[in-house]
Amino acid sequence: MKVKVISVLEDNYMYLVIEESTRDAVAVDAAVPKRLLEIVRKEDVVLRAVLITHHHWDHARGNEELVRLCPGLRVYGADERIGALTHRVAPDEELTFGAIRVRCLFTPCHTKGHMCYFMWEDGSLDAPALFSGDTLFVGGCGQFLEGTAEQMYTNLTQVLGDLPKETKVFCGHECTVRNLKFALKVEPENEAVKKKLAWARQRDDEDLPTVPSTLQEEFLYNPFLRVTEEAVQKFTGRKEPVEVLRALRTEKDNFKKPKERPHPQAMLAFDWGLFAPFLEKK
């Protein structure tokens, strides 16, 4: 199972998961169809389905166009607000695409219909992959836009946290540097945070992605997975894990975003007219 990381818009990621023996492929969060189909042609694969983590435009806006360009394409997701949806999936439902297996992990909070996708390939020794959308990021987690701290705690500690620690994490956005800057504020003595931040800055300087991480790594430097650690509790002034998580999210929401260089893929959004509706004169 090969995963192609595709940078689009300002800081989004799409993914193309390829079964190398058959050259069939499944995409995750196909927001920019033209870019996705460029990669499909370059890799010489057949796109069979699209898995959508949630309905937000920067993850799902390309569905209608993609279905038009690829007749018969299946679009999977859990939220009725997802455009061009052909298959509504249920929590813990398993899907099969050739040798690629998918378990649908329901993680409501960022949106009420958010679904993560846990993938592995039958007979392969490769580590499984988690496509976590806007629930779990490298060094962070998504905002609680339609849910609660209790829900996110369950998502992070049980639904995702119980997966094999070698699982590779492919998240929905490139926000690692700013996440780890916040993590360093929370745990200024955490050497794992310092090391990962230095690495992420180097990757950013080279316009390279910081995905995937692994679940095992995330438990070392991601404060939202470290709510039982003394240093994290001291930072928040809370002891109960859900309250620690709630306080962390509030602090992160108010954390000043560092000035980052514009991602080179951001300008492609203008080239493809993605912002045209917002720029038209009224």
UniProtKB/Swiss-Prot annotation:
Binds 2 Zn(2+) ions per subunit. Keywords: Hydrolase, Metal-binding, Zinc. GO terms for biological process: methylglyoxal catabolic process to D-lactate via S-lactoyl-glutathione. The keyword Metal-binding applies. Zn(2+) 1 binds at residues 54, 56, 110, 134. GO terms for molecular function: hydroxyacylglutathione hydrolase activity; metal ion binding. Zn(2+) 2 binds at residues 58-59, 134, 173. Its EC number is 3.1.2.-. Pfam families: HAGH_C (PF16123), Lactamase_B (PF00753). Its cofactor is Zn(2+). InterPro entries: Clx_II_MBL, HAGH_C, Hydroxyacylglutathione_Hdrlase, Metallo-B-lactamas, RibonucZ/Hydroxyglut_hydro. HAMAP family: Glyoxalase_2. Hydrolase acting on ester bonds. Belongs to the metallo-beta-lactamase superfamily. Glyoxalase II family. This is Hydroxyacylglutathione hydrolase-like protein. The gene is HAGHL.
